[in-house]
Amino acid sequence: MIKFVDIKIGDDVTFYALIENMQKRFTPNKSGYYGATLSDGDSSIDARIWDCNLVESKDITAGNVYRFTAHVNEYAGKAQYVIKNIETISE
């Protein structure tokens, strides 16, 4: 399983992670997005979900593990994961 420590800025990645917390926020021009803290079991990262429909249409909630597809950008000198897709995991 891929760990956050192995992912570099500029990478396009698919990984499994726990949503530790997630909050809907708004940009200065009132566009909605979600800020989330994701954990791979060893470390946590900051993620942005610019497409609110990814969260709202699939009933994505904190405290659960999902499969994410993301692009890693650099923002303010740190890695920022921009989530492109979220998939629920069947048991």
Task: Report the location of each language-model feature.
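OB-fold nucleic-acid-binding modules
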Residues: 1-15
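OB-fold single-stranded nucleic acid-binding module
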Residues: 22-33, 43-91
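N-terminal basic/disordered segments at the start of proteins
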Residues: 18-20
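Acidic/polar residues in short coil/turn loops that connect beta-strands
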Residues: 38-42
